[in-house]
């Protein structure tokens, strides 16, 4: 690559080709003969010495890189916030009786309802910027006019673009953000400049391309799968493609005036969010931006970051405007009622909410406060699935919506399988006329005609048409891409009246419905079932209400378990999710940044939003530190030395007593004393003190979800205990037996609150002390009235022992005679003696002086902690991780100790669709040399497939051997990572390259039909196509790699792999193109 292709500060670092024995540079490297750098030859002291030298070298480079950074930004930009204003706008809409056939709001005399919304503006400016308030800006020669009156937020945002200043538009789905993006495109094309429109996913890029092509004509598309008209004035692309263009110094960037980032809140995505951050940092300062986002509460923080790193103004235009107001309803599971809980004015209807909760209470059990009640007929209903009567409830809701003419409806479910099951449940209903069926079938057949004949008979295609003809659709990631697209088109054209969809349908083009239904408001996030967050709920519910068509959008939440009012409010009325950085270092990123002059990995870290968010908190912490110091200086303690000594001894005794408690409650010592009726003092998590309770029973802890789960000794048993002091903030569903985690809303009662008697499950580490008394315990504590009898006994015992219930002596009663334990007890005795000799022990002022000193001591500790936080925030975050990753790259031979990139590093720079380290090692080890193209494709599928599926059958030798060789190299890389102090579990790293589809890919490359390979796996058809598309991307990158290292045989092999993969349904294009 010629350095003249690079823009601004980018200049490629020259890289020496390897020399042969005659000292001549060898351009055609035989990768099979390249020395293996994966063996780390240094051990013990030599390795420590190497690490020490690397750190010294690293520190010098950081200083050097800092000076480069400072040269580029001679003045650190401290953004100035200005031009803050808020506009209140109101409008009148027709009154609506909604689903409950009753007036929901106060109606004006003219029969209208008045609704209001806000538009807020603020701008982050570089210091001394010559700024004119946005309200004073007059658009003279507008790039684009509109046949309708712009909403206030659109008008403000367009004024920002008109005068060439970046803007973040934060607004709800369907609010009209696209109008702002279109103005930026129109202005760029008018000025003969180029504009880039980025989107988070390829499917959305394809849809956006089609939309913008119809609007502007001069539009191109670049997604990795396809390139159309790359010389167009407006280019639509994925963010990954833009990042790749920036790293390669594409000539296109010289002509770009504006970059539009759609769905920029994607930046918080753990996996891909870093791509947005990298791209924004790498873009030249001369470029201006339009950021389109869902509502985010910390938008100004983002604007300040843009202003700081690019030395330009960045406006924030926020609105809570919804073109179609929403009504939010609760539908309790297995019930008949529906309850309006949030009206068009966003008022939470507490009374209706409580009615809905009471309705659930009647379904779950007789006693809403009971922790041991069971569902009727022994059934417990849990959110997140379409089991039990949930399908019947959906049937009921959809029929009601159809009857009241509130269709089309999107039914959101968090499971692909549930979407299909629920849709099949509706298959008896028919929402389409004969004319609609005929038109729909024609559109469907025209789309499917693009596929080869053999693929038109796929089960997924054949089975879905009868549903579609009835006006019922399904949309999830497991569908074939062509089916997803035809369903989107049918939905937009009004042929589908009910669409069952997963969460992914809430991302992308404007495809609203009149009604949105949530089959559950709990979801599995990969680790646990949790309530849907406010941001997730806003994003999905925002699909309700079609602008210009509906007077109201309807949102219905099906709930089958108790929900606290604050949870419901947080979901439907709460703040959207914050935009927090998900920045993390990757090897490809580090190597690409090493490759160009004038920029470095340290530069990326310093300019990341992640770093900015840490540093921005420093002034607040410094203010807090000053307040703490003032409080600290204001406390004077008389006789401070003696008070200090008393405090230190008491804290030491407290620590030793905790050690004693750990020994006493260890299963080996405690279990034999935990007979039914034994009194135990309970403190859950060290803070929730339930006081004294009576043991019911105990059992070994078993995790049915994860049988291999490992617990500490204290966590390995569950003890069921009767307590008198439980308080429930709101009705909570039953506690499962042997579940040590108490649900939200359950806590000890505070003074004045009415507590209840209940059985709670705890672990041994929640036992504060074991009493010397036992109560009578009934055989069946859950029988009617038995808990209350034990509770009464507990109250009586507490009354009889006002000075405290006697506890078991660890030595005399429990016979703990371990030598170390006896020494521990002796230490406590010695300290108690020392404490009694302190001059203040019998002083009347002890309590007062001790309280003052404790407060002063706590302030001192808080100050120390805050100083450490300030220091950590001001330091460059993730710098240690960068050092460790560079060490890995050096030991693998990807770069020199001076950060000069080697040939291996150049290869890794080209790979972003798979693990760059392992793939590079496979290439340089010659692992592909002896493989046939179909074997190579099968091996590469391990990098392209990321989903879970059932275990694949035993692999054929021609596949098992390449897999074994790859895993051996992966294990070596993992060892080098561990030796370089990177947290990695070798087994997890090796097994992250999933082999389950190796045989599927192998047979596909040998000519099997798609129908045949679908029968070989339980993976959804759409997931298979997605894997093949990823595989194609990866193979294309390896073709580029072969060119980079001049390996013609590898290039020919990878080109052959591409031909084998790219056929039939895998090669089918998008309907949007």
UniProtKB/Swiss-Prot annotation:
Q: What is this protein called?
A: ATP-dependent RNA helicase DOB1
Q: Which residues carry this modification: Phosphothreonine?
A: 34
Q: Where is the Helicase ATP-binding domain?
A: 158-314
Q: Which residues bind ATP?
A: 171-178
Which residues are annotated as modified residue Phosphoserine in the UniProt record? Answer: 84, 843
> Which segments show compositional bias classed as Polar residues?
360-372
Assembly notes = Component of the TRAMP complex (also called TRF4 complex) composed of at least HUL4, MTR4, PAP2/TRF4 and either AIR1 or AIR2.
EC number(s) on record?
A: 3.6.4.13
One GO cellular component term of this record is: nucleus
Any idea which UniProt keywords this protein has? ATP-binding, Helicase, Hydrolase, Nucleotide-binding, Nucleus, Phosphoprotein, rRNA processing
- Locate the Helicase C-terminal domain: which residues? 393-597
Q: Which residue windows does the record flag with biased composition (Basic and acidic residues)?
A: 34-74
Misc. comment: Present with 12500 molecules/cell in log phase SD medium.
UniProt region (Disordered), positions on chain:
1-75, 360-388
Q: Function of this protein?
A: ATP-dependent RNA helicase required for the 3'-end formation of 5.8S RNA. Cofactor for the exosome complex that unwinds secondary structure in pre-rRNA. Required for nucleocytoplasmic transport of mRNA. May serve as a chaperone which translocates or normalizes the structure of mRNAs in preparation for export. Component of the TRAMP complex which has a poly(A) RNA polymerase activity and is involved in a post-transcriptional quality control mechanism limiting inappropriate expression of genetic information.
